[in-house]
Every structure is written in C-alpha cells, then in structure tokens.
Amino acid sequence: QFGYDSSIDPYKSTFFDFVPYNEEPRVLTGGDASKISVVHSAGYKTYFDWDAEQGKYMMSQYSKAAGGVQPSVDANNDEQLKFDNVIVLFTDIHVFPGHEAKDLQEVDYKFGGLGYYFNGGRVEPIRWQKGAADQVLRLVNDDAELTNVKVNPGRSYIAVVDLDEAENFSYTAAAASADSAAQ
C-alpha cells in the first residue's frame, strides 16, 4: 500500500552471514589468538590485543612520530578502539599504472584468497571471494564446500593486506604458546 516490498527482510545482512543476534555467539575452532600483528608496510603496522575482561580486541598502531606503538584512540570519546571481530584478508596490492608519483594503490578484490577471522580470543583460517564490482564479498570456510563463515555480531575491523606483507603477519596464543604465522 505504501510502495514497500514486505517480502524483503530489512534485517537480513547481505554483507556477511552473521550469527543471529538473539543466538549465542559461536566459538571459533582454530585455536587461541591473544595478539595479532598486521603489517601493511614498514611505516604502517596495526596490533590487536585480546582483553578477556572486556571481551574485545584492543587496537594499537605503530607511530613513527611517537617512536613506537600507541593505542588507537577514538577522538569522540578518548577511548581505545576495540573490536569484537578482526578479519584479515590477503590480496595483490600494487601501484596503479600511471600513478607511480602519487603512490596510488590498486587493490585486486577479484583475486580472492586466504584470510583469518578472529573473535573471542580465538582464530579460524578462512578464504574470501569477490567477483565483479557489483558482487558481495564472501567469507568462506577453508573447507571443500566453501560454506559461508558465520560471523559473530559486533564491531568488526577488516584489514586488506598486500600478499607481499603476508610473511610479516602473525598472531600469538596466550603466554605459553608459540607464535603462529600466516601460511
């Protein structure tokens, strides 16, 4: 009557396959991950530390000006940025042809590839897919069926990282465990 298509569910996400907010969050199966280190370049490094009390990943970044790693702070409330979900995706990133002087970067989203999903102090290796510009980004399980990853609700940070920096990416389990690195 008002021109609204009632068959469309406005609460169904088209971006990720989220666990419904009224269900218990799922526990990731890939192991513990209390520290995450994402290197984008020599001068751009992002870190996440799991805070079990808050149930969030706390974000910090390397600051050349400050001479070290500093908490990333929200200017609106002076609180350190914190995330329920951290998603790291690897793809080809290179200088856009003809724009070398401005260092304009081209990101190959059609590439698809490997990634990691972090939530609840845990990690799962994933794959991701994206076709044409009008197709959605899909996070899929690293299994033969490529089923959608069920992402827990909450604030999410997505890092798209150049394949050249994959060897510098790492995550660490709680104190007694050894480092795990991107494969």
Question: Which positions does each model-derived feature cover?
Answer:
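A surface/extracellular/periplasmic glyco- and lipid-processing/surface-interacting theme
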Residues: 1-183
